[in-house]
Amino acid sequence: MTAERTIARALLDGDAGLAERIGTALLKTSPCNFVERPWGGMRIRAYKRLCPLPDQPALTGAGLGEAFEISAYDADDEAREHPSRVRFEDGSSAALPALLRRHAERWLGPELAERHGGAFPLLPKTLDVRELLSVQGHPDGHTEAYVIIDAEPGATLRVGFNRDIDPTELEAALTQGRAWQQHVLELVGDRLSPARVQALVAPWLSSRQAGTADVADELWAAMPSAERALGESLLEKLKKLYWRVLDSMNAIPATPGTVIHNANPPRIAAARGRPAAAEVHALGNPEGLEFLALEIRRPGPTFRAWDNVRFPLRRIDVSAAMHVLNLRRVDPEELVTPLEPVPGHPGLFKSVRDPSFEIEHIRPSLEGTVDVPASGAHCLHCISGAATLTGADGRALGTLARGESALVPIGVGAYRVTGAEADTEVVKATPSSGA
């Protein structure tokens, strides 16, 4: 390419010959596509081998909760706001959605490109969960999987109800809880910011034994006794609801290597007579024990039913969430998914088979190799170690180190993964044929 016409520019201009060549190797995306979240942590930068930053949560009130690994689906608001970028050998770069608008048929294959209008139908993210996410659900057909990468000892995540739930009772309780939160803010007025209220209330909520006296002095300072008593009563009610909701869900250990397929078990989907959806989930735990996970999911909406008494108030939609959630009991054993060896391919394992995606795990030993058969376009995520990839004809396809991801075009075909470090693992996520 000339100085005036970079690889990125040529591809965006529709250079078919160049797209053919580029589409036979990895399309590595930027590892820094971070999004701040109030529940996020700071382990994700070290995981991605990036230099540490100051304590961002203390500065902004939010940590780096997510990294959008492969984001190229403009019909989804989040994906459109945080598109992936691909950097080429000449140093130029371009947004992946714009590249796919030009070359989706060549890189994704005609069938996938036609079904999704030139977009990639998965939205994989790396999550850094330090505090509880909201209690949430997704529409029919929208399931998720979590591959636990690293975790503090004792970390858990809530997935699925552990008992049958009365829908009318739960919806009324969550709606009332939001009204109580609003009333607390009205009582506090402008004496404290919502962020300060959160800083005071969050540790008190997470301790079952703590009484309101632990937060009362600053929250209700100089307040008339009647209003102070009302405020303390509201907080006590909110705390009971906080734990009632959490205790109604399965607390699944976030153990590194665990794979959780968050989808209605077949017995539930059959009873509902609807396509499987994700079970109710609130990733994270009240103890604040941090974990990293690779999340594989389709792009699509999230309905928050309850935000675990978080301040400032974020938007929730209790009725929409109740419409999509399965309220019947689910056992953790129906969600945790074992890895199964792929016959004839040593070092290759399969975990999740979902109507929207399939997940495989490539685990070469140090300097060992794993042969991966040809498949449709997919994404790769190196979650530990480092790997070198070569094509079936021996051509170099690229490298992946821990925390890096790539889109693998359909033209790559079969390839070999060689471990460059001990304990290397690369997760492969492929859109299912019906996705």
Predicted regions and their residues:
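Ligand-binding loop in jelly-roll beta-barrel domains
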Residues: 119, 129-130, 139-141, 151-154, ...
